[in-house]
Amino acid sequence: MTTSSHSSEQPTSTQTSGMWGGRFTEATDAFVAEFTASVQFDQRFYKQDIAGSIAHATMLAKVGVLTEAERDDIIQGLSAIKSEIEAGQFEWRIDLEDVHMNIESRLTQRIGITGKKLHTGRSRNDQVATDIRLYLRDEIDDILTILLRLQKGLLGLAAQNTQTIMPGFTHLQTAQPVTFGHHLMAWFEMFVRDTERLQDCRKRVNRMPLGSAALAGTTYPIDRAFTAELLGFEAVSENSLDAVSDRDFAIEFNAAASLIMMHLSRMSEELILWTSAQFKFVNIPDRFCTGSSIMPQKKNPDVPELIRGKSGRVFGDLISLLTLMKGQPLAYNKDNQEDKEPLFDAIDTVRGSLMAFADMVPALGPNIEIMREAALRGFSTATDLADYLVKKGVAFRDAHEIVGKAVALGVQEEKDLSELSLEQLQQFSDLITADVFDKALTLEASVNARDHIGGTSPKQVEAAIARAYDRLEKLYA
C-alpha cells in the first residue's frame, strides 16, 4: 500500500473540478466553489462517513467488485484518515466541497488508484443520506440518555416532596392545593412523551438508503442487506428515488426536538417565576445562576431564561427544514445541502438544554413553608367546600353559588375560608357544620381527598412515582 503526505498546496484548475472534470471546459469559479462547499459544517459526519465507506467496501468485496486486498487497503486507509482527523492533523479543503470528497481524496493520496474504486456503485446522494441517518441515530441515543437522567432527577425530587403542599394554578391564579411532587410528576409526563417520540422517530431514521446511488439504483450486484447489517440498520429503503431525497426523518426529529424545547421552556418559565422575590417557592443553587454588573443583590436564573430563549431557535430550525423541502421535485437537489445546519443546531441546542436541566433539577430546593403559605391564600379550598355541600345533598351549581358568596365575604374581610368563623359560614348554608374545617378547609384534607390514579394525594403521587420507575425501565429496555 502506498502512502503520501497530505499536501497543503492550493488545487489546480483540474483538481478543482476533479469530481466531474470530464464534462466541463473550465474550472469552477473560486467564489462558486466556496459558496457551494459544505465541508465547513458537514465534516462533523466524518465518523459516519468513514463507517459507511468501510461497510460499502466490505460489501463490494463480498460481491466481487473489489478484491480482498483492495478492501483491506481501503479499510486500512480509512482507519488511518480517521486517526488523522481525531488528532487534528487532517486538512479540510473547501475546493473538495464536502466531507465525502475530502476523505475520498485523502484516501487516494494514501493508497493510490484503489482509493478511486471506493465510490463504485455509490453516489454522494445516497452516501450523505446514509451519513445523516447514522449521525442522527447516534445523537438520538445520546439525547435519550440525557432525558433519562433528567427524568430520574424529577422522580427523585418528587419522592422527597410528596407531602409538600403548594398552590396549583389556572390562568396563573390560585386554583386548588396540589403537592409539589404532583407538579414535578406533570413535568415528568411531558418528558416521557418526548422519549416515546424520539424512540418512534429513531425507527424511521434507522432505514438505510445506501445502494440507491444517485436516484435509480446501481447496475452492480450489491448486497444492501449485508451493508445494512454491518451498519446496524434495521432495514433498507424500498424506493431509490425517495431514499435519496427523503428528509422526513430530520423534520420529524426537529419536531420532536421542538416539543422537548417547548416543555423545557414551560418548565423554565415556572422556575423563573418561582425563584422571584414575589414567589420564593424554589431556590436554584448559585452555580446555575449569574449576577449583575451593576446591581449587587441580583441572582439571576440565567439557565432557565436562556433555555426559554433557545426554544425559539429550535422552532425556527423546524420551519427551516419544512420550508427547505416543500418545493423540491424528486429526486435529490442541491437545496438539501441546507438541511444540515438546522438539524445540527436543533441537536446541539436540545442536548445542551437537557444537560443543563438534568444537572439542575436534582439540586432545586423548595421553600416548603412559603409554598404552604401561598396555598393558604387565594381561597384554594373553595372547590372542596362546594364538594362538601354537594355530599350533603346540595346541587353542585347551588353549592357553587353559596361558596362564591362565602369567598366574597372572605375577600371583604381579608380572610381565607378557613379563617372565617362557623357562624359566618352558616349564614350562607345551615348545612355547614363544625366538621367543615377538618373535612374541607384544610390543605391536607384537600389534597388527601383526591385519592385516585392521576390525583394529587401523597398516596397517589407515591404510587405514580413507583409506576414511573417501571415505565422507564420498559421504555429504555
UniProtKB/Swiss-Prot annotation:
Pfam families: ASL_C2, Lyase_1. Keywords: Amino-acid biosynthesis, Arginine biosynthesis, Cytoplasm, Lyase. It catalyses: 2-(N(omega)-L-arginino)succinate = fumarate + L-arginine. It comes from the Bacteria. Its EC number is 4.3.2.1. Pathway: Amino-acid biosynthesis; L-arginine biosynthesis; L-arginine from L-ornithine and carbamoyl phosphate: step 3/3. It is found in: Cytoplasm. One of its GO terms (biological process) is arginine biosynthetic process via ornithine. GO terms for molecular function: argininosuccinate lyase activity. InterPro entries: Arg_succ_lyase_C, Argininosuccinate_lyase, Fumarase/histidase_N, Fumarate_lyase_CS, Fumarate_lyase_fam, Fumarate_lyase_N, L-Aspartase-like. Residues 1-21 are annotated as: Disordered. Residues 1-18 have a biased composition (Polar residues). One of its GO terms (cellular component) is cytosol. Belongs to the lyase 1 family. Argininosuccinate lyase subfamily. This is Argininosuccinate lyase. It comes from Acinetobacter baylyi (strain ATCC 33305 / BD413 / ADP1).
